[in-house]
Each structure stands twice: as structure tokens, then as C-alpha cells.
């Protein structure tokens, strides 16, 4: 009984200290807890006032500065990107890029007046969107146009090569690595010097394609942001060629990207099998065959007359039978090469041999046959 009285007294005292209208502190605490919970989960009204950090800004814009690509290998994205970009092999394209490496080695040596070695790292297929996300920044991206193919390509020069080229062209000492200055845009001098190098590479690329199909490559613009160098849809496939350029202790990489849509007009030519060092028209063999053709021995027949006789008469011919010809001593004979009539001539004698003197130029049929051989 005493315990019940004590409990009632305690409840009355608590009620007097906390009137029904005084529960705002509890509600405020509840609201505060809800606000904290919403802040922890990224929701609620407080989330709209929060300032994003740099990682969240890069993720929102689609940049991946970490370079590990771990996000692409987890979850649903890993399932979506699990299918490898596999397209038909283009044998002649490998020969074109091999020729490009040899041409660039000579051209860049003349361009830099230095010992330059160009090597082909690999040729692969990649989605255009994946390539844009994988470009290491800072870099200079050159958008060029393939005139005859009516499409575009992309050439990427990394930061190491940019500073190396600038250092070499401006008289940097050999044996010292080029100094990199991060955190600033490329200067006008750097862009102009790199543009000259890109024009040399595009000229070599034109020469590499010329034996297969004449293509002119012209520089369209230079970009430093991959988002402004979009020449195809993100899901479109492209050929990626990685080239390594070494200049003693300096150097860098050039990446050449050609969408499959750009190569589509000459796809049949690129599918051909490589049959030798030269492909297409070979001037050496053409001249050799022309020389040998003029010295070829051919059989020429002089036909005096032709007759049609019954088969029975031919089968019954005996020694001593006479066959009368519809020709006189003054009749012209026809000169033939196989079944092709060449010209007509008159028979005679020269020294101790019977000869034929041509009395007319080559017939139209003979000229047409010679043109077919050409």
C-alpha cells in the first residue's frame, strides 16, 4: 500500500514538472534524431544543403581519377560490361599500322633531329565511351577527319610526350627527363608544337593507307576535355592503337582511335589476307611483266584460202588427190595469230625463202584483242 502511494506521488510530481503542452523537448529530440538519421542516410531536407566533395563531383560528371576501375568490376555494371568487345579481325589494318610505325620513326627523327624510336604496343577493340573514361588526364586530344571516308578519328597525346616534345624542340639537353608542371592548362606554345607533331603523324597515316586506299587525314580541332571530343556514340565500337615513342630518356604515348563506322567503306579491303610486303599495285612487277610481254614469241600463220568440204571427202582422201583453191598468184593472204586476224599481205620470195609483205595495218579485231591484254 505504501509502495502504491509512493508511485502515485512520483507520477503527480512528474506531471507537474512536464505539463501536456510541455512535450516540445521530446518532440524536438525526436525530430533531431530523425534529422540525424536522415543525414546519415543521405536523405531528408538537410541533404540538399550539404556541399559535395571532389570525389562525388567527379562521379557525378563521369570522371574516374583513381584509375583502378573498381566500380566497373562490381555489381550490375560488371554484368553489363562482362561481354568483351569482339569484332572481326582486319588483317590488312595490322599491316597499315605496321607501315605507320616505320614511317613515323623516320618522320619524327627528321622532325625532332633526335634519336626517336616508335613501337606498336597493341591493337584492340573498345567501346568509345569506355575509352573516353579511361583517358589519363591531362592530355591533348586531336579530332581529325578522314576526307574520303567521310568520318572522324581521334588521336590522344599523353602529358609525358607533350612535355618531351616541347623540351626537345626548344633545345632541351639530352639525357635529362622533361619537367612536368601539373595543375595548369597547356600554353599556346605547347599546343602549337604538339599540333605540328600531330600533323606529321597524320601525314604518315595518309601514306600508310595509300597503297590500300587513298585517304586524306586533316586536323579538325584540339581538345583537352574528353567530353568535347565525342566523335561517336558511347556504345559504338572502335579500333584502338597504342604507340610508344621513346627519345633516349624521354618519351610518351600516342593513342589512335578509329571507329568501325569510319573504316566501314573500306572494310572489304581490310579483310584481305596479306600476301607480301607490298599490297595493291606493284610498279616493279608491272614493268617486268610489260618487258617480258614484248619479247614473247607468238605463232603467226599465213592463210592463203579456206574451203568447206564434206567430211566424207576428207575421210576418203588419198595420196595424189588434188584440192583446188579459190586463189590466184596475185591473191592476198591473211595473217593470223591463233583465231585473231591481224592483217593481209602479198606473197613473194626473198633470197631463198617465201615471204609475205603486209599490205594493210592491223585490223580492228587485232587492236581490240591487244587492248584486252593491257
From Swiss-Prot:
It is found in: Cell inner membrane; Bacterial flagellum basal body. It is a peripheral membrane protein. GO terms for molecular function: cytoskeletal motor activity. It comes from the Bacteria. GO terms for biological process: bacterial-type flagellum-dependent swarming motility; positive chemotaxis. Gene3D superfamilies: CheC-like (3.40.1550.10), SpoA-like (2.30.330.10). Its main location: membrane. GO terms for cellular component: bacterial-type flagellum basal body; plasma membrane. Belongs to the FliM family. This is Flagellar motor switch protein FliM. The lineage of its organism: Bacteria, Pseudomonadati, Pseudomonadota, Alphaproteobacteria, Caulobacterales. The gene is fliM.
Amino acid at each position: 500500500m505504501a509502495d502504491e502511494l509512493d508511485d502515485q506521488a512520483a507520477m503527480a510530481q512528474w506531471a507537474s514538472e512536464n505539463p501536456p503542452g510541455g512535450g516540445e523537448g521530446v518532440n524536438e529530440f525526436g525530430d533531431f534524431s530523425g534529422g540525424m538519421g536522415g543525414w546519415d542516410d543521405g536523405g531528408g531536407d538537410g541533404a540538399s544543403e550539404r556541399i559535395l566533395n571532389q570525389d562525388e563531383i567527379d562521379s557525378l560528371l563521369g570522371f574516374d581519377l583513381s584509375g583502378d576501375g573498381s566500380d566497373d568490376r562490381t555489381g550490375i555494371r560488371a554484368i553489363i560490361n562482362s561481354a568483351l568487345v569482339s569484332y572481326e579481325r582486319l588483317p590488312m589494318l595490322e599491316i597499315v599500322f605496321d607501315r605507320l610505325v616505320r614511317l613515323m620513326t623516320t618522320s619524327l627523327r627528321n622532325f625532332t633531329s633526335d634519336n626517336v624510336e616508335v613501337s606498336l604496343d597493341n591493337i584492340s577493340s573498345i567501346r568509345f565511351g569506355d575509352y573516353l573514361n579511361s583517358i589519363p588526364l591531362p592530355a591533348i586530344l586531336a579530332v581529325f577527319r578522314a576526307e574520303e571516308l567521310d568520318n572522324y578519328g581521334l588521336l590522344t597525346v599523353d602529358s609525358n610526350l607533350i612535355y618531351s616534345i616541347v623540351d626537345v624542340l626548344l633545345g632541351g639537353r639530352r639525357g635529362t627527363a622533361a619537367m612536368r608542371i601539373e595543375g595548369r592548362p597547356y600554353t599556346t606554345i605547347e599546343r602549337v608544337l604538339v599540333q605540328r607533331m600531330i600533323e606529321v603523324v597524320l601525314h604518315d597515316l595518309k601514306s600508310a593507307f595509300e597503297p590500300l586506299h587513298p585517304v586524306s587525314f586533316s586536323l579538325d580541332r584540339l581538345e583537352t576535355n574528353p567530353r568535347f571530343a565525342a566523335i561517336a556514340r558511347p556504345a559504338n565500337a572502335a579500333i584502338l592503337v597504342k604507340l610508344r615513342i621513346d627519345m633516349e630518356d624521354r618519351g610518351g604515348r600516342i593513342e589512335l582511335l578509329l571507329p568501325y563506322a569510319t573504316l566501314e567503306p573500306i572494310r572489304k579491303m581490310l579483310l584481305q589476307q596479306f600476301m607480301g610486303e607490298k599490297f595493291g599495285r606493284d610498279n616493279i612487277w608491272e614493268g617486268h611483266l610489260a618487258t617480258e610481254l614484248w619479247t614473247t614469241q607468238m605463232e603467226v600463220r599465213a592463210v592463203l584460202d579456206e574451203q568447206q568440204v564434206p567430211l566424207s571427202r576428207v575421210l576418203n582422201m588419198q595420196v595424189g588427190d588434188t584440192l583446188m583453191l579459190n586463189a590466184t598468184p596475185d591473191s592476198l593472204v591473211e595473217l593470223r595469230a591463233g583465231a585473231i586476224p591481224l592483217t593481209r599481205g602479198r606473197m613473194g620470195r626473198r633470197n631463198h625463202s617465201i615471204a609475205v609483205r603486209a599490205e594493210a595495218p592491223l585490223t580492228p579485231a587485232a587492236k581490240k584483242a591487244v587492248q584486252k591484254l593491257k
